[in-house]
From Swiss-Prot:
Keywords: Chloroplast, Plastid, Ribonucleoprotein, Ribosomal protein. GO terms for biological process: translation. It comes from Amborella trichopoda. Its main location: plastid. This is Large ribosomal subunit protein bL32c.
Length: 57
């Protein structure tokens, strides 16, 4: 027969939520940093062909 489990304490709940949020924040910072390095051309892990626009007069 199913028995209800004990309630999780608030401190444990906050720890788990903060850890989950921190993981997302770190992933966002890493993605932003990679995007910034790719856009400036300083990336060492991605090879992006830079396109230059020339104006003809």
């Amino acid at each position: 027969m199913a028995v209800p489990k004990k309630r999780t304490s608030m401190s444990k709940k906050h720890i788990r939520r903060n850890y989950w949020k921190r993981k997302g924040y770190k992933a966002a910072v890493k993605a932003f940093s990679l995007g910034k390095s790719v856009s400036t051309g300083h990336s060492k892990s991605f090879f992006v062909q830079q396109t230059t626009t020339k104006t003809n007069k």
